Curated annotation (Swiss-Prot):
Signal peptide: none annotated. ATP binds at H18, D178, G179, K180, K249, F250, D258, R264, K265, A281, K285. The keyword Transport does not apply. Pathway: Amino-acid biosynthesis; S-adenosyl-L-methionine biosynthesis; S-adenosyl-L-methionine from L-methionine: step 1/1. It comes from Rhodococcus opacus (strain B4). HAMAP family: S_AdoMet_synth1. It is found in: Cytoplasm. This is S-adenosylmethionine synthase. One of its GO terms (cellular component) is cytoplasm. L-methionine binds at E59, Q102, D258, K289. The keyword Membrane does not apply. The gene is metK. PROSITE patterns: ADOMET_SYNTHASE_1, ADOMET_SYNTHASE_2.
Length: 404
């Protein structure tokens, strides 16, 4: 149902130097390296970082070779951790690797689906690949922004990206890699009307004046720059509360300040809390894992549905059983914004999209090294990189199937 009245909604983002995002970047960089030489590699790589140490563990079955310690160090250095004074140093950190093979019991369900083993197989080769796990995945889209994302998470990601840009370009050379942003938007019903609060917490060099240097710089070079880019004249930005490093100084950051883990920023990775989440993380997983590939597919479905004018706001859920090709469930929620019968929308989605894992991989061309670029700043609604699940190539077909 659509809601009426004024309310505040908040989403957060983090920079690539956040400890959890270091881990996501390492896991996805290893995945990309393996997919480059072996597109059918089965990969599930988890990373942990702490003071001076990187631990990589997981299951991999592949014909490819990846120099994991080198990938780890290169990734850490590219993020910007090149000195212990910054909380981490890719040149000297310890790297521990503990990688085994994928369980043969899991592999048999992916390689030979339930449909194959029970004689339900059609002539369609796509039926041969089963889901890599059971689970439920959600996709979401809304008319909040041109990229059909919720405005709070879209702005939070833009602020985080800009925070990294001004650090790496030398515009604000005293910034360090670790950082977080948070955006609170006032909604009138379902319409974003005012930017209420922005929080920016960023690691910085010692002896930086918070009030006289950091805050004015971030207001102009980060917040001001992002606001100048957005084309939303109806959004009131006249009285923004900006909170910079509300705890005071932020010198001790990165893995020295907090341990990091792969897959611990799943709301940042998706819709900033405005949509439900099935619980599965993305990074370090090859596309046979429906946690990743089906979540991408559901964003594709939702974005095409909104682009087709079927609803102003839509959430779609798909569910799988491990080893089975066909989804066990599909659910569509339009929050009262639908332009036709929701049952008709669901039927149109079923007719337009093949949500078997093999079909998703085929249609979105997922057996490619495209994943490291998604490790920070969100997997959805990206305007800075080209991602196949952001295409609206099925919108017209979907609209026709819905009878509009």
């Amino acid at each position: 149902m659509s809601q009426s009245g004024s309310r505040l909604f908040t989403s957060e983002s983090v920079t690539e130097g956040h400890p959890d995002k270091i881990c996501d970047a390492i896991s996805d960089s290893i995945l990309d390296a393996l997919l480059t030489d072996d597109p059918r590699a089965r990969v599930a790589v988890e990373t942990l970082v702490t003071t001076g140490q990187v631990h990589v563990a997981g299951e991999v079955t592949t014909t490819a070779y990846a120099d994991i310690p080198k990938i780890v160090r290169d990734t850490v250095l590219e993020i910007g951790y090149d000195s212990s004074a910054k909380g981490f140093d890719g040149n000297s950190c310890g790297v521990n690797v503990a990688i085994g093979a994928q369980s043969p019991e899991i592999a048999q369900g992916v390689d030979h689906s339930h449909e194959v083993r029970t004689g339900e197989l059609s002539d369609d080769e796509i039926d041969r690949q089963g889901a890599g796990d059971q689970g439920l995945m959600f996709g979401f889209a809304t008319t909040d922004t041109p990229e059909l994302m919720p405005l709070p998470i879209a702005l939070a990601h833009r602020l985080s990206r800009r925070l990294t840009e001004v650090r790496k370009s030398g515009v604000l050379p005293y910034l360090r890699p670790d950082g977080k942003t948070q955006v609170t938007i006032e909604y009138d019903g379902d319409k974003a009307v005012r930017l209420d609060t922005v929080v920016i917490s960023t690691q910085h060099a010692a002896d930086i004046d918070l009030d006289n240097l950091l805050t004015p710089d971030l207001r102009e070079k980060v917040l001001g720059s992002v606001l100048a880019e957005i084309d939303m004249p109806e959004l009131d930005v006249s009285d923004i509360r900006l909170l910079v490093n509300p705890t005071g100084k932020f010198v001790l950051g990165g893995p020295m300040g907090d341990a990091g883990l792969t897959g611990r920023k799943i709301i940042v990775d998706t819709y900033g809390g405005m949509a439900r989440h099935g619980g599965g993380a993305f990074s370090g997983k090859d596309p046979s894992k429906v946690d990743r590939s089906a979540a991408y597919a559901m964003r594709w479905v939702a974005k095409n549905a909104v682009a087709a004018g079927l609803a102003d706001r839509i959430e779609v859920q798909v569910a799988y059983a491990i080893g089975k090709a066909a989804p066990v469930g599909l659910f569509v929620e339009t929050f009262g914004t639908e332009k036709t019968d929701p049952a008709r929308i669901q039927q149109a989605i079923t007719e337009t999209f093949d949500l078997r894992p093999g079909a998703i991989i085929r249609d979105l061309d997922l057996l490619r090294p495209i994943y490291a670029q998604t490790a920070a700043y969100g997997h959805f609604g990206r305007t800075d990189i080209d991602l196949p699940w952001e295409s609206i190539d099925r919108a017209e077909k979907l609209r026709a199937a819905a009878g509009l």
